[in-house]
Amino acid sequence: MAKVPDMFEDLKNCYSENEEDSSSIDHLSLNQKSFYDVSYGPLHEGCMDQSVSLSISEISKTSKLTFKQSMVVVSTNGKVLKKRRLSLSQSITDNNLEAIANDSEEEIIKPRSAPFSFLSNMTYHFIRIIKHEFILNDTLNQTIIRANDQHLTAAAIHNLDEAVKFDMGAYTSSKDDTKVPVILRISKTQLYVSAQDEDQPVLLKEMPEINKTITGSETNFLFFWETHGTKNYFISVAHPNLFIATKHDNWVCLAKGLPSITDFQILENQA
């Protein structure tokens, strides 16, 4: 069984959003460190673990401050008490700070549960083809094959010449380098796997060449590739809770899980 290699050395050099933000702001760094650099005198022990309310004048003399993602309220020992995501262009005011400090409900922001509107508004840039002519098998040892001109299916086969061979192209986004977006193309063709809705078959769509930049409605061509040991998962960028899946006596589709099969083995060098 081929070992899934560590891929995307190219992605390790991607800059983070914080680095991009800090270079574009003259008087105030929005890196996480800047929230802790404000100098204050020591607090009494009884004040520990209480939220610290900061006014605009204490943070900066700049009259208007904008930021991209979120701000936090922390205790004096560094423990995060509350997180709040605001508008991309919303100014921070004293009222914002008071509302966050006094809000009894803590909002936990999880990058992996980013809403569709956020992911679909991101721009993905093509890096390179990272895998050539590999085969996908599900956990029932079924192999993905062509059902017709537009659809794929899974079946137990004896001749690997019947299997669909895929190429995998890697993309990156400056806004999120924690995931691995890829595009799947049938080898030696210009047919690309395209997602639809839940329980709907994935489609094979022809494009004259691989998209160098993908955004908006075109994200249905992208999938987040995740690996766990020898298991590989392909999560739709357009529908982040749905996986490429096989289903008994059905076409390859998008599904959340059982009874569909969402984990695959990649077989390389089968030409």
From Swiss-Prot:
Residue span of region Nuclear localization signal (NLS):
82-86
Record text about domains: The similarity among the IL-1 precursors suggests that the amino ends of these proteins serve some as yet undefined function.
PTM annotation (Phosphoserine): residues: S87
Q: Which residues are glycosylated?
A: N102, N121, N137, N141, N211
The molecular function terms in GO held by this entry are: copper ion binding; cytokine activity; interleukin-1 receptor binding
Keywords of the record: Acetylation, Cytokine, Cytoplasm, Glycoprotein, Inflammatory response, Mitogen, Nucleus, Phosphoprotein, Pyrogen, Secreted
Q: Which PANTHER family match?
A: INTERLEUKIN-1 ALPHA (PTHR10078:SF33), INTERLEUKIN-1 FAMILY MEMBER (PTHR10078)
In its UniProt entry, the species of origin is given as Macaca mulatta
Summarizing the function annotation, the protein's role is:
Cytokine constitutively present intracellularly in nearly all resting non-hematopoietic cells that plays an important role in inflammation and bridges the innate and adaptive immune systems. After binding to its receptor IL1R1 together with its accessory protein IL1RAP, forms the high affinity interleukin-1 receptor complex. Signaling involves the recruitment of adapter molecules such as MYD88, IRAK1 or IRAK4. In turn, mediates the activation of NF-kappa-B and the three MAPK pathways p38, p42/p44 and JNK pathways.
Q: Which residues form the propeptide?
A: 1-112
Query: What name has this protein been given in UniProt?
Result: Interleukin-1 alpha
Gene3D superfamilies assigned to the protein according to its UniProt record, in alphabetical order? 2.80.10.50
N6-acetyllysine: residues bearing it: K82
**What is one Gene Ontology biological process annotated in the Swiss-Prot or TrEMBL record?**
fever generation
Per the record, GO CC terms?
A: cytosol; extracellular space; nucleus
**Subunit structure, briefly?**
Monomer. Interacts with TMED10; the interaction mediates the translocation from the cytoplasm into the ERGIC (endoplasmic reticulum-Golgi intermediate compartment) and thereby secretion. Interacts with IL1R1. Interacts with S100A13; this interaction is the first step in the export of IL1A, followed by direct translocation of this complex across the plasma membrane.
Changes after translation: Acetylated within its nuclear localization sequence, which impacts subcellular localization.
- Protein family according to the UniProt entry: Belongs to the IL-1 family.
